[in-house]
Design a protein with these regions (language model features):
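N-terminal intrinsically disordered/low-complexity leader segments
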Residues: 1-17, 191, 195-220
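Basic, helix-initiating cap at the start of DNA-binding domains
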Residues: 1-34, 38-50, 67, 76, ...
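Short hydrophobic/aromatic patch on the recognition helix
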Residues: 50-59
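Alpha-helical DNA-contacting segments of helix-turn-helix folds
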Residues: 63-73
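Hydrophobic/aromatic residues within well-ordered alpha-helical segments
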Residues: 73, 132-136, 140, 190
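Hydrophobic alpha-helical connector segments
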Residues: 75-117
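Hydrophobic alpha-helical bundle segments that form small-molecule/ligand-binding pockets
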Residues: 107, 122, 134-160
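Hydrophobic/aromatic-rich alpha-helical bundle segments in the mid-to-C-terminal region
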Residues: 130, 147-193
Length: 220
């Protein structure tokens, strides 16, 4: 994974191979080392060996860098929902798709944790967070709407979308704070409880599964 995009000869503009992903890697490193507020677009561009103009070809602001992967997740959600067979129950489909889209390689987890910690701790990112979470929620609501034959902005699809988002944000927060289990286990436990209407027996079963996973990780 490239972290230095400088090219020789003092060439200005976009070096060969510069991409949104490469700028993202550099920006995340700078955010970690210097803080989000003290890292300017100029600093990111300089570290990448590109101009500010090139940076803005990829991102509208430095905050957008943190949401690059998230936007891809929303697209992946929609694509996965489109492939779900109609006989799969609604909440089972949502649980399956959300957990599947959030399977990360072990080497990508530290970066994901850094990203989520920044999003959760920097006040300046809250407005962009609201916009992105809304797009994620709409992906769920749109799928629910197609299943029940109602407009996406009607009560039931909106309820499904917002409840699912709340459950997943709780799972993300818990995972980010503890680092004791795979993210998918936290998501699966939260969505299983939601699908069961937070029935106490279902919650105990999900909690037991999560606890067993944590115990296995502790001895490996």
């Amino acid at each position: 994974m490239a972290t230095d995009l400088r090219t020789g000869g003092g060439r200005r503009g976009r070096p060969p191979g510069t991409s949104a992903r490469e700028l993202e890697v550099i920006a995340l490193r700078l955010f970690t080392d210097h803080g989000f507020e003290d890292t300017t677009v100029e600093r990111i561009a300089a570290a990448a060996g590109v101009s500010k103009r090139t940076f803005f070809r990829y991102f509208d602001s430095k905050a957008d860098v943190l949401w690059h992967a998230f936007d891809g997740e929303v697209r992946a959600l929609r694509a996965a929902f489109a492939a779900v067979p109609p006989q799969v129950p609604l909440m089972a489909a949502i649980r399956q798709v959300v957990v599947g889209v959030n399977r990360y390689r072990a080497e990508d987890v530290p970066e994901l944790r850094t990203r989520m910690n920044l999003i959760g701790s920097v006040p300046a990112l809250q407005s962009s967070a609201a916009i992105r979470y809304d797009s994620w929620e709409r992906a769920i609501s749109d799928f629910a709407a197609t299943r029940v034959g109602q407009p996406a902005d009607s009560l039931y699809p909106l309820t499904v979308g917002r409840a699912t988002l709340a459950a997943c944000r709780a799972a993300y927060d818990r995972w980010s704070a503890r680092a004791d289990a795979d993210l998918t286990f936290y998501l699966d436990a939260a969505l299983a409880a939601l699908a069961a209407g937070f029935d106490p027996a279902a919650i105990r079963a999900s909690a037991q599964t999560l606890s067993q996973h944590i115990s296995r990780r502790a001895v490996t």
